[in-house]
Amino acid sequence: MLDRRDFLRLSALASLGTLAGCATTPAAARIRPITRGPKFHWRGYYDKFLFSADDRFVLANEVDFEGRSPTKADSIRVGMVDTQDGDRWIDLGGSNAWNWQQGCMLQWVPGSDRHVAWNDREDGQFVTRVLDVKSNRTRTLPHPFYTFSPDGKTAFAPDFARLDVTRPGYGYATGAERDIWKLKPAPDDTGIWRMDMATGQQRLLFT
């Protein structure tokens, strides 16, 4: 039977052998930056579809400042990087509805190899932009989105203005005072919304 000292010695030798084996294993992938300064680039949340179906294009947000929270006047650019053409930046549009945590929800629409969606602001209201990257045509839907159904036909979203007060950093700035105690508790006219991506029709699911 091994005593404690022998057990620790053998365990240490086994660990060294494992590390030695790792040291001789060649790297399986090469990592490189695909965006360049002087502007700042980031992607947003990890659950978004950022790679095109063929893995050639990668979506990203672009902004010219950092170190402070965005205001309702701040805008960003959205684009995609062509990884097969010297990581060339392709500008797709802009957004005035975004935050540092999640950007403007920029992503490929599930099930599509040509449609990209993001949130924006128009006439004081949050909206969804849907761009066909092959025809360069853009549709605007009258409400924002947070996530899509797996088939990309339905979108779901919270109240981003209310979220900016209840969870600063995750909603979109409106200029309103961020005082949670001044909000109406559990209002009947807002909550989690469902939107038809074909028609833009919206329905309140939960309050």
Question: What would you call each of these model-derived segments?
Answer:
Residues 35-40, 93-99, 202-207:
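Surface-exposed loop and turn segments in beta-propeller and other repeat-based domains
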Residues 6-24:
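N-terminal export signals
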Residues 58-61, 115-119, 157:
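Residue position within the beta-strands of beta-propeller blades
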Residues 47-52, 107-111, 148-149:
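Structural signature of eukaryotic scaffold interfaces centered on beta-propeller domains
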Residues 45, 73-116:
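Blade-loop segments of beta-propeller domains
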Residues 103-105, 119-191, 206-207:
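Asp-box/WD-like beta-propeller blade repeats and closely related beta-sheet repeat scaffolds
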Residues 76-83, 130-132, 189-197:
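Beta-propeller blade signature
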Residues 34-73:
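Beta-strand-rich domains and repeat architectures in extracellular enzymes and scaffolds
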